[in-house]
Amino acid sequence: MRVLSFLCLLLVSYASAKQQFSELQYRNAFTNWMQAHQRTYSSEEFNARYQIFKSNMDYVHQWNSKGGETVLGLNVFADITNQEYRTTYLGTPFDGSALIGTEEEKIFSTPAPTVDWRAQGAVTPIKNQGQCGGCWSFSTTGSTEGAHFIASGTKKDLVSLSEQNLIDCSKSYGNNGCEGGLMTLAFEYIINNKGIDTESSYPYTAEDGKECKFKTSNIGAQIVSYQNVTSGSEASLQSASNNAPVSVAIDASNESFQLYESGIYYEPACSPTQLDHGVLVVGYGSGSSSSSGSSSGKSSSSSSTGGKTSSSSSSGKASSSSSGKASSSSSSGKTSSAASSTSGSQSGSQSGSQSGQSTGSQSGQTSASGQASASGSGSGSGSGSGSGSGSGAVEASSGNYWIVKNSWGTSWGMDGYIFMSKDRNNNCGIATMASFPTASSN
């Protein structure tokens, strides 16, 4: 009843908003989106979700029509409000303001102009954490997988590691399973435990409260130490990611992040200190935000149906994090395919900055970025804008970006990846809480 009452209130709010497209355009776009994302609703919920979708479609159009480096789209989160997204998929923000400027041990390396650890074979395929606030565990396994691969030298031994091992077994270190945790605490567990099991031997279930099933015989990697990056220093983060993939915490709370599709992500409203999501930096690059390139496998045709994707629960329970652990505790990408943490899409498929999506000409149809184009009208440029939130002055783009691996499956972003702005005052706090492990070569 509480959910239905909430949705009824949303109906009143969205029904009164000014519509940017015809009802036929909205309806066809929603129908196509529901088919693409295998979404079904009860009769009571359908109209509320439809109104939310319309509002998100308007937001995407407004943002993209301004032209810019960030392209939004009607992705897997297009039928939920930003408040639902925050409550259901992100943790309580961790305040990292006290960390800014904290000096850490210098990382002595001369960074290459560009780095992409996917191309080196050091990154496993995109995973999906499902209905569990365990992004901290995915960020941890990602950096540990990369460190192990690099330490293996000529063996080039890339092993997918078990997030469930961390969720079930690291609570005594201060982590809280599906309710939140920190990557650094997970590193401490792996060090003291003398290893972490492989994913194949300890598969992901997206469930909490299970008995620890770690077995020494199933260890896939070991680490001997970890190091924090100087907080707030993107130069230090670049030096670190020049050597290996790096675990980071970010502010992922804005609607622009929720509906991100491609391009270099820059959000003036992003906080550099209020961090609610753990992800993995797998490299960095530079390029014009208007250059064309692969759109991460998303069709630019007018149908917007794309490939079949996993259904996301729009009414899942929020994953609250325990105090001090929310920097990487967000419950992101909670799709119904939670029991499988690894998607079929291989990493390393993204290249270059993404361009806006082309629109079709069919009446009532939408482009891959969700722009209605009926009779050639209304789609806008589709090239994105860096200031959709309308807050703050927009800093000039450096054209530089971090290559970031998320854990929300391949139906979000560029096949599960996002290019985040680099060298723009630590946008979204990407360098505020960064750390990486050193693996044993054994």
From Swiss-Prot:
Keywords: Disulfide bond, Glycoprotein, Hydrolase, Lysosome, Protease, Repeat, Signal, Thiol protease, Zymogen
Gene3D superfamilies in the cross-refs: Cysteine proteinases, Cysteine proteinases. Chain C
Family (UniProt): Belongs to the peptidase C1 family.
Keyword hit for Transferase: no
Active-site residues from the entry: 135, 277, 406
Start-end of Gly residues biased regions: 377-391
Matches recorded under PANTHER family: CYSTEINE PROTEASE FAMILY C1-RELATED (PTHR12411)
Cellular component GO terms, alphabetical: extracellular space; lysosome
Propeptide: 18-111
Low complexity biased stretches: 287-376
Protein name: Cysteine proteinase 4
Post-translational changes noted in the entry: Glycosylated; contains GlcNAc-alpha-1-P-Ser residues and fucose.
Matches recorded under InterPro entries: Papain-like_cys_pep_sf, Pept_asp_AS, Pept_cys_AS, Pept_his_AS, Peptidase_C1A, Peptidase_C1A_C, Peptidase_C1A_papain-like, Prot_inhib_I29
UniProt cross-references to SUPFAM superfamilies, sorted A to Z: Cysteine proteinases
Enzyme superclass (EC): hydrolase
PROSITE patterns referenced in this protein's UniProt entry, alphabetically: THIOL_PROTEASE_ASN, THIOL_PROTEASE_CYS, THIOL_PROTEASE_HIS
Protein's cellular compartments: Lysosome
Pfam families: Inhibitor_I29, Peptidase_C1
Organism whose genome encodes this protein: Dictyostelium discoideum (Social amoeba)
GO molecular function, one term: cysteine-type endopeptidase activity
EC number: 3.4.22.-
